[in-house]
Structure formats: structure tokens, C-alpha cells
């Protein structure tokens, strides 16, 4: 739409193909689309978050789209060039590295519910929610509360986020899942960011996620 919100990657243009994660033997880079052909590259020494990053200081570079990908001009001897599915990283005091795009997924994505689990939603009906509505794509519409109440429990939730490159912070696909009506687990696009308590997976105002796994 005019605000730059997309539900389908095919409609999002080339920026959606450039945004993502790139991995090498000793470095990981997350590239964030910022709209209007602009990007930010976040360089992690050791590997991607949750996959080798040493949790040290990150290096950030600003760049722009080219006819073949994106270029991030040199800053403090670091530079990035993306061509297709490959990222060329210039590293100070070392040989340049070639990183390839990776598509990480949660190991629990699509997993079967364990024995004895209560399935609240499987895409067939929304009877376990009030009000409960299903979108034309078979997803549970936001604004629904479970009919049943729970105390101590483990909840498995799968969700998708729209691609909103021009939005920033809490305006980037912001939503949440309330537990017991009081603890809000953040659901928003915080890809490439620090991972604070108001970002994806954080318990709002209470606890930051152990690792930012917004993929």
C-alpha cells in the first residue's frame, strides 16, 4: 500500500530480496531495508545472533540499492557490497570475506503439539477464542482472547509480520500476545535491532529476550 506495508514478498519489490541474513565462517551480517532504496548492514563478529555471535560491539553501515544489489561505502575500514545472494565484506586488517544469504527458521516451526497439549487454533475454526475470527488466508485475526483460562503453562505461538521498510521502532508491525491478561510478549519486526524488552520476544517493560531471533 502507499504506506509501504506488504504481506507478500512478491509484491514488496527488490528491497525484500536484499533484506535478510548473510553468513560466513566467522562473521554474520543482517541487512535491514529502510525504504526508498536505503539499507543498514549490521555486522556481527563470530556469526549471526544465536549462531556464533560473540555478543560484542556491532558494526553498522548505511547503504543504498544499486542495479545489482546494494553498496555500503567504507567506514572505519569496513565496507559491504551485495550482489545477488552474495555479500562481499571488507574487513580491516584481514582478507575480504564472501558471505551467502541464509534463511533461518525456528526449530519448532510447524512442530506437532506434544501429547496432552490443548490446541487452541489449528486454522480450521476459532471456537476457542472470543471474539474469534479467521482471515481469508486461514489465520487467526488479532483482538481475540482465549475462552479458557490458564495458570502455569507453556505456549507455542507462530505468527507472521508484514514487511514495512519505511516504518521505524514500534511502528514496524507492532502487536503482542498477552499472557493471563497482564504480561505482553512483543510481536513486531525488530529484525537486526538490539533485542530490548519492547522488541520481538521481549516481555514488555519487564524482560528483554535472551536473543533477538526476529528472522
Question: What name fits each language-model region?
Answer:
Residues 1-7, 25-28:
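Charged, amphipathic alpha-helical segments
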Residues 3-9, 14-16, 34-38, 42-215:
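Carbohydrate-interacting regions of secretory-pathway proteins
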